[in-house]
Amino acid sequence: MTKIYLAGPLFSLAEQGFNAELARFLEREGFEIWLPQEHEPRDNTARAIFEMDVAAIDWADMVVACMDGADPDSGTAFECGYAYAKGKPIVCFRTDFRVAGDTASAPYNLMLSESATARFEVPFRTKPEEFRQRMLETIRKALAAGRGV
């Protein structure tokens, strides 16, 4: 069973709901998921949260990371960088149709987009089932490719 660390912003109820829904979908598809928001009590220290997340990335076979927002979440960016340094495949996705990259055509910062093994952006008005299918296809592509673009 492939183990996935699911990275992304988790600071609003909407973000937490999206993350949890994606995690349950991937579990139904046979993946083992580590979703940080489900493992870190609010009273943990910053150091404990950091160490837990790093250990979870070490445990995972790959990282799947949400790049939504005006600029992708800084914690998510670190998690991707750490996974890249460890040689793990990374899938980056963006459901936010605003442009947040280094150039007009880039969806987000080039250090994130170029470190991804596979990535995709979701066009405006994409149906949830289309997003889920695209996610599965991209994860499979990344696993087949291993690390690197």
What are these regions (language model features)?
Residues 1-149:
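Conserved catalytic or regulatory cores that recognize and/or transform ribose-phosphate-containing ligands
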